[in-house]
């Protein structure tokens, strides 16, 4: 099949499926978080809890009818997350004496710390080989569970911010974190994951509690083939925008992603919740135009990145690439350029980080676009929850800039954006660039770093430039809770394990704290009626301002770093 036709069919299928799911799934998620009798972000008294939910609240000694201010909401979220880090760390350290160990011993302290932080922060950065490091019990009880709850945590923050925009309560209550966490996990993530797992099973994705299978090759030698409960974890890996593979090759492995159809299904699973959350936002604020405007910004950025990556990888350079007809190094033949490019842009535009191709083998322009996709803040369309609250924070900054241009006090959906609000929004946006640039700068300054780079050499050579891009990609991935990597960089040293672990922690929880503080301050305000001079946050004009703000922030912050890495590599 012609490559352009294949690309068009895949993109068309994904867009059609998202369009079909947009209204029903978006409205359903709004009902999950606002109760069955009202789509307004009102109190929790209208929510009907299921028996399973009531049992969980009873065991956890949680009063589901009690609401929390932003401080209480934040403390609950942080307490739950850090308890999860400790549990997952201990589980890895004692897995050798637990059932289903498969003969695997305890995970080393550095790897256990990095992995615990990685999965709790929804990053799923993997500095280990899953088949030879993690037991099936650790995968199922530890990592798979975190795939659900870490995604649900992102959902809770997005919903809390929407409530902050909508509500006008004197106490600034944002809801109940525990209720939002449980309902997001049980009513959204679990059903969708079950459906996707069944589809993947039909395509040949494996599901086994056995650790390995012994086969005999054609030459008579024995072959040790790793097995695992792949389908169940593969589904939530994509639905929850997690990305950590149960097998080392991730979604390039035929046991995880066997066919072109399964590849498209996984792409759809990655995008469906972040895209449909814009409808949830529309429904909860009572204005359908708001979500469509946000979606148009996401779609513009996503489409631009997809066009750039597809063009870069479809333009053969060199004799081997010209013979193949495209830049096929590091890509699976069963997916080709269209499937690999669409998957790569989807996984870096969200916080997923799953891969069906080797990103390190992409061209300088293609790989640079993937880095930039993360450096935009992963808002096109972003991770589960994280993409929505990230792009709404940038919308508030765009409103502030627009207000300054017209000489009016900035307002966002009737709420004034004053010094406290813009400070919280700015701090939320500045965390990631600080972590990326500081982490990259220190790492390349260390003399030991070159020993861990697959590409190094004299300064200014293509190899050394690509080595810099590998380090930049690593910290962009960690700080944005993405988890993908340029595989040429070895990250098993204590420095990378610790520094990337801290980048994941701070990159996840500092923006959450600032976003919830912003939501709390907005919730206490009364709405100001719109007037003739109000800057409306819907329509093409604001969409353009919003998109321009996103690109301007990224360009001013990261252009020097990109010029030293992928841009320099592309022009050499």
Swiss-Prot record:
Just give the chief location class: membrane
The UniProt entry lists membrane topology as:
Multi-pass membrane protein
Cysteine pairs bridged by disulfides in the record: none
Domain of life per record? Bacteria
Q: Which GO terms describe its cellular component?
A: plasma membrane
* UniProt keyword terms in alphabetical order: Cell membrane, Ion transport, Membrane, Potassium, Potassium transport, Transmembrane, Transmembrane helix, Transport
Which Pfam family, any one, appears in the UniProt record? KdpA
Record carries keyword Phosphoprotein: no
Q: Which residues cross the membrane?
A: 5-25, 71-91, 97-117, 142-162, 188-208, 258-278, 292-312, 387-407, 422-442, 500-520, 548-568
Q: Name one GO molecular function term.
A: P-type potassium transmembrane transporter activity
Q: Tell me where in or outside the cell this protein is found.
A: Cell membrane
Q: What does this protein do?
A: Part of the high-affinity ATP-driven potassium transport (or Kdp) system, which catalyzes the hydrolysis of ATP coupled with the electrogenic transport of potassium into the cytoplasm. This subunit binds the extracellular potassium ions and delivers the ions to the membrane domain of KdpB through an intramembrane tunnel.
The text of the family note is: Belongs to the KdpA family.
How is the subunit organization of this protein annotated in UniProt?
The system is composed of three essential subunits: KdpA, KdpB and KdpC.
What is the name of this protein?
Potassium-transporting ATPase potassium-binding subunit
Query: Which species does the entry assign this protein to?
Result: Mycobacteroides abscessus (strain ATCC 19977 / DSM 44196 / CCUG 20993 / CIP 104536 / JCM 13569 / NCTC 13031 / TMC 1543 / L948) (Mycobacterium abscessus)
Q: What gene is this protein a product of?
A: kdpA
């Amino acid at each position: 099949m012609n490559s352009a036709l294949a690309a068009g069919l895949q993109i068309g299928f994904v867009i059609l499926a998202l369009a079909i799911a947009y209204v029903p799934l978006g409205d359903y998620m709004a009902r999950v978080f606002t109760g069955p009798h009202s789509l307004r972000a009102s109190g929790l008294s209208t929510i009907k809890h299921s028996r399973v939910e009531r049992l969980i609240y009873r065991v956890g000694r949680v009063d589901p009818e009690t609401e929390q201010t932003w401080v209480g909401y934040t403390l609950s979220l942080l307490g739950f997350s850090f308890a999860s880090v400790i549990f997952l760390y201990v589980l890895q350290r004692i897995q050798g004496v637990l059932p289903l160990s498969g003969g695997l011993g305890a995970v080393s302290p550095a790897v256990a710390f990095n992995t615990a932080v990685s999965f709790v922060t929804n990053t799923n950065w993997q500095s280990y080989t899953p088949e030879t490091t993690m037991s099936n019990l650790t995968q199922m009880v530890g990592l798979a569970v975190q795939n659900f709850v870490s995604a649900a945590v992102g959902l809770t923050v997005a919903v809390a911010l929407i409530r902050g925009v909508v509500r006008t309560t004197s106490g600034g209550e944002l809801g109940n974190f525990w209720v939002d966490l449980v309902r997001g996990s049980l009513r959204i993530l679990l059903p969708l994951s079950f459906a996707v797992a069944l589809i993947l099973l039909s395509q040949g994705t494996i599901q086994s509690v056995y650790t390995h299978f012994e086969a005999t090759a054609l030459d008579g030698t024995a072959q040790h083939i790793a097995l695992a409960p792949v389908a169940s974890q593969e589904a939530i890996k994509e639905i929850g925008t997690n990305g950590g593979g149960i097998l080392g090759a991730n979604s390039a492995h035929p046991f995880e992603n066997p066919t072109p159809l399964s590849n498209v299904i996984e792409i759809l699973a990655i995008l469906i919740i972040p895209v449909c959350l814009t409808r949830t936002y529309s429904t909860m604020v009572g204005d359908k135009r708001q979500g469509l405007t946000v979606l148009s910004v996401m779609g513009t950025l996503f489409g631009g990145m997809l066009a750039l990556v597809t063009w870069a990888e479809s333009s053969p350079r060199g004799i081997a690439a010209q013979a193949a007809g495209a830049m096929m190094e590091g890509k699976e033949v069963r997916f080709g350029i269209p499937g690999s490019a669409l998957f790569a842009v989807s996984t870096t535009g969200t916080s997923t980080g799953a891969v069906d191709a080797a990103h390190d083998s992409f061209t300088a322009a293609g790989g640079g676009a993937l880095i930039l996709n993360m450096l935009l803040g992963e808002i096109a369309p972003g991770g589960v929850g994280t993409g929505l609250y990230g792009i709404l924070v940038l919308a508030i900054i765009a409103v502030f800039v627009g207000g300054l241009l017209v000489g009016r006090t900035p307002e966002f959906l009737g709420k004034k954006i004053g010094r406290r609000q813009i400070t919280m929004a700015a701090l939320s946006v500045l965390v990631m660039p600080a972590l990326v640039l500081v982490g990259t700068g220190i790492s390349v300054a260390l003399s030991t770093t070159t020993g861990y780079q697959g590409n190094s050499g004299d300064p200014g050579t293509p190899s050394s430039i690509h080595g810099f891009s590998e380090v930049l990609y690593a910290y962009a991935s960690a700080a944005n809770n993405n988890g993908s990597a340029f595989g040429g960089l070895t990250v098993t040293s204590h420095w990378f394990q610790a520094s990337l672990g801290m980048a994941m922690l701070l990159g996840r929880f500092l923006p959450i704290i600032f976003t919830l503080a912003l939501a709390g301050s907005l919730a206490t305000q009364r709405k100001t009626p719109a007037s003739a001079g109000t800057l409306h946050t819907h329509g093409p004009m604001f969409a353009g301002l919003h998109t321009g703000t996103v690109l301007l922030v990224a360009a001013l912050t990261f252009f020097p770093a990109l010029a030293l890495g992928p841009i320099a590599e592309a022009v050499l």
